[in-house]
Amino acid sequence: PETAVWGFDGQVPGPEIRVRQGDTLRVELRNGLPEPTTIHWHGLRVPHAMDGVPHLTQPPVPPGGSFTYAFRCEDAGTFWYHPHANSPEQLGRGLSGALIVEEPEGAAPPVDRDVTWLLSDFR
Protein backbone atom coordinates (compact mmCIF):
# COMPACT_ATOMS: atom_id res chain seq x y z
CA PRO A 1 0.00 0.00 0.00
CA GLU A 2 1.00 3.59 -0.54
CA THR A 3 2.41 5.63 2.32
CA ALA A 4 1.51 9.31 2.54
CA VAL A 5 4.74 11.18 3.25
CA TRP A 6 5.57 14.71 4.32
CA GLY A 7 8.85 16.24 3.22
CA PHE A 8 11.08 19.18 3.94
CA ASP A 9 11.25 21.24 0.74
CA GLY A 10 9.06 18.60 -0.95
CA GLN A 11 11.48 15.70 -0.60
CA VAL A 12 12.05 12.67 1.64
CA PRO A 13 14.52 12.64 3.23
CA GLY A 14 14.84 16.42 3.45
CA PRO A 15 17.65 18.18 1.60
CA GLU A 16 21.16 17.71 2.90
CA ILE A 17 22.36 20.91 4.54
CA ARG A 18 26.12 21.48 4.36
CA VAL A 19 27.89 24.38 6.06
CA ARG A 20 31.39 25.17 7.32
CA GLN A 21 32.26 25.19 11.00
CA GLY A 22 31.79 28.73 12.30
CA ASP A 23 29.21 29.65 9.63
CA THR A 24 25.77 30.93 10.56
CA LEU A 25 23.00 28.61 9.41
CA ARG A 26 19.75 30.36 8.52
CA VAL A 27 16.66 28.26 7.70
CA GLU A 28 13.12 29.53 7.29
CA LEU A 29 10.51 26.92 8.20
CA ARG A 30 7.20 27.55 6.40
CA ASN A 31 4.70 25.08 7.78
CA GLY A 32 2.57 23.53 5.05
CA LEU A 33 1.43 20.67 7.29
CA PRO A 34 -2.08 20.26 8.70
CA GLU A 35 -0.61 20.44 12.23
CA PRO A 36 2.02 22.43 14.18
CA THR A 37 5.70 21.56 13.74
CA THR A 38 9.27 22.63 14.57
CA ILE A 39 12.82 21.71 13.55
CA HIS A 40 15.20 20.26 16.13
CA TRP A 41 18.90 20.29 15.23
CA HIS A 42 19.92 16.97 16.76
CA GLY A 43 23.33 17.02 18.45
CA LEU A 44 24.17 20.65 17.67
CA ARG A 45 24.89 23.20 20.36
CA VAL A 46 22.40 25.94 19.51
CA PRO A 47 20.88 28.86 21.43
CA HIS A 48 17.95 27.75 23.56
CA ALA A 49 15.43 29.64 21.38
CA MET A 50 16.64 27.77 18.26
CA ASP A 51 16.41 24.21 19.65
CA GLY A 52 12.98 23.39 18.20
CA VAL A 53 11.39 21.83 21.27
CA PRO A 54 7.73 22.94 21.23
CA HIS A 55 6.35 24.59 24.39
CA LEU A 56 9.84 24.55 25.95
CA THR A 57 12.26 26.44 23.69
CA GLN A 58 9.74 27.90 21.23
CA PRO A 59 6.03 27.86 20.43
CA PRO A 60 5.22 25.27 17.75
CA VAL A 61 4.87 26.75 14.26
CA PRO A 62 1.15 26.56 13.37
CA PRO A 63 -0.14 25.42 9.96
CA GLY A 64 0.53 28.26 7.52
CA GLY A 65 2.97 29.92 9.94
CA SER A 66 6.71 30.40 9.66
CA PHE A 67 9.77 30.63 11.90
CA THR A 68 13.37 31.52 11.06
CA TYR A 69 16.12 29.50 12.70
CA ALA A 70 19.51 31.23 12.74
CA PHE A 71 22.56 30.10 14.69
CA ARG A 72 26.31 29.69 14.42
CA CYS A 73 27.54 26.13 13.81
CA GLU A 74 30.30 25.75 16.38
CA ASP A 75 31.07 22.02 16.05
CA ALA A 76 32.09 20.09 12.95
CA GLY A 77 30.38 16.74 12.45
CA THR A 78 27.49 14.81 10.95
CA PHE A 79 24.11 15.66 12.45
CA TRP A 80 20.46 15.41 11.51
CA TYR A 81 17.38 17.58 11.76
CA HIS A 82 13.81 16.53 12.51
CA PRO A 83 10.62 17.81 14.15
CA HIS A 84 9.94 17.59 17.86
CA ALA A 85 6.20 18.26 17.45
CA ASN A 86 4.17 15.04 17.19
CA SER A 87 7.47 13.28 16.47
CA PRO A 88 6.13 9.73 15.92
CA GLU A 89 3.82 10.85 13.12
CA GLN A 90 6.05 13.52 11.59
CA LEU A 91 9.22 11.41 11.63
CA GLY A 92 7.21 8.40 10.48
CA ARG A 93 6.05 10.36 7.45
CA GLY A 94 9.62 11.24 6.47
CA LEU A 95 10.41 14.60 8.06
CA SER A 96 14.16 14.43 8.65
CA GLY A 97 17.36 15.33 6.89
CA ALA A 98 21.15 15.35 7.19
CA LEU A 99 23.15 18.34 8.39
CA ILE A 100 26.89 18.25 7.75
CA VAL A 101 29.12 20.83 9.43
CA GLU A 102 32.46 20.63 7.63
CA GLU A 103 35.79 21.52 9.19
CA PRO A 104 37.55 24.63 7.86
CA GLU A 105 39.07 24.30 4.39
CA GLY A 106 42.14 22.05 4.49
CA ALA A 107 41.55 20.82 8.06
CA ALA A 108 39.95 17.49 7.13
CA PRO A 109 41.99 14.64 5.62
CA PRO A 110 41.54 14.21 1.87
CA VAL A 111 39.08 11.54 0.73
CA ASP A 112 38.12 10.11 -2.67
CA ARG A 113 34.43 10.52 -2.06
CA ASP A 114 32.10 11.87 0.62
CA VAL A 115 28.65 10.25 0.61
CA THR A 116 25.80 10.76 3.07
CA TRP A 117 23.32 7.93 3.68
CA LEU A 118 20.14 8.66 5.59
CA LEU A 119 17.88 5.63 6.02
CA SER A 120 14.31 5.48 7.23
CA ASP A 121 11.60 2.83 7.49
CA PHE A 122 8.01 3.82 6.73
CA ARG A 123 6.37 0.54 7.78
Residue ranges of model-derived segments:
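Histidine-centered copper-binding motifs that mark active-site loops
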Residues: P1-R123
